[in-house]
Amino acid sequence: MAVADWEEARGRMLLDPTVVNLNTGSGGPLPRSAFERVTGFRAHLAAEPMDFLLREVPALLWQARESLARLIGGDPLRLALATNVTAAVNLVASSLRLEAPGEILLSDDEYTPMRWCWERVARRHGLELRTFRLPELPSDPAEITAAAVAAMGPRTRLFFFSHVVSTTGLILPAAELCEEARARGITTVVDGAHAPGFLDLDLSRIPCDFYAGSGHKWLLAPTGVGFLHLAPGRLEELEPTQVSWAYEPPEGSGPPAARDRFGSTPGLRRLECEGTRDICPWLATPESIDFQAELGPGAIRARRRELTDHARRLLADRPGRTLLTPDSPELSGGMVAYRLPPGTDAAELRRGLWERFRIEAAVAEQPPGPVLRISANFYTTEEEIDRLADALDALTGE
């Protein structure tokens, strides 16, 4: 897709023209077509619930499962749909029986609720939670692999890490990390919250046991889209967080790993079914996937790179700011993060960006100091990044 077409693509997004949106890493806006699709499904659900749920949903659900599986290089028969990464990871964490004494290994920069999740597992099972330090501004993915491998040992029962680190946008070498863990008999759980739509994701090349992803960020799918992709043979280890109608498959459902009449498989549906609820976001996911396919995923990634390079050039020459995201395309994508000067109040800065300048950007306390993360996507403009730079100067007195 030519650069000149990005303005047209921006016009196809639901964007508030008064807001500079630099926070796709927390939640992406919807393409208008995806909004119309999910709204249409909800209108049918509201008007005639049983017709929609019993007669329309099964085919739509299987279509969504297949579409998402193709995008991520997965198997639809091993792809459980979920609300988000948090739900998917907690499903795994609440199900696995890890041998004690032993250890759960994490990187030192994981999403806080996920760290809490594994801390709870460690307490319940009598395990130790250990972290390894991610290299600062690595120039080669092998540096990350070496740091993780050095922390693995005979007591390591499970290794959890983010494919893309939320704080900095650092991309971890997921395939290599999972290969090293598997060679040592260590179960792997990967937090892929940022990966769908952000990376050229191919789960067939990542030998992980459990891979969780979200759709409401870079995939630009409706809020409420997540997934859990399972390695062969791991489904039987999982128990649903809620017992509902799919807990015992109805007579004639067929094998646990075969497509059923509900748009799932008996094994997957057991994990997915939470009673009557709104799964319209799942059903609308193909629209978001098709939208980005039309623009060209490679072109989108290249455009993000142009925008983050512009942000790097613009923000580099400011005293007190420390770059936290590597420059290598192997290690970074559409996000770039900076450590802000000591004494900066993260909450006040974020409030000032929004209230004075209508800029949405992630600013958070992250010891040893606050971090600003810029998430640029194809609908971002260079002028918007210029506005951020000017706003930062105004708010920090530079």
Swiss-Prot record:
EC code(s) of this entry: 5.1.1.17
Gene Ontology terms, MF aspect: isopenicillin-N epimerase activity
Annotated signal peptide: none
Cofactor(s) the record lists: pyridoxal 5'-phosphate
InterPro entries xrefs: Aminotrans_V_dom, Aminotrans_V_PyrdxlP_BS, PyrdxlP-dep_Trfase, PyrdxlP-dep_Trfase_major, PyrdxlP-dep_Trfase_small
Catalyses which reaction(s): isopenicillin N = penicillin N
In-chain residues carrying the UniProt-annotated modification N6-(pyridoxal phosphate)lysine: K217
Keyword annotations: Antibiotic biosynthesis, Isomerase, Pyridoxal phosphate
Pathway info: Antibiotic biosynthesis; cephalosporin C biosynthesis
Pfam families cross-referenced by the UniProt entry: Aminotran_5
One Gene Ontology biological process: antibiotic biosynthetic process
UniProt similarity note: Belongs to the class-V pyridoxal-phosphate-dependent aminotransferase family.
PANTHER family noted in UniProt: BLR1280 PROTEIN, L-CYSTEINE DESULFHYDRASE
Function description: Catalyzes the reversible isomerization between isopenicillin N and penicillin N.
Protein known as: Isopenicillin N epimerase
Lineage of origin: Bacteria, Bacillati, Actinomycetota, Actinomycetes, Kitasatosporales
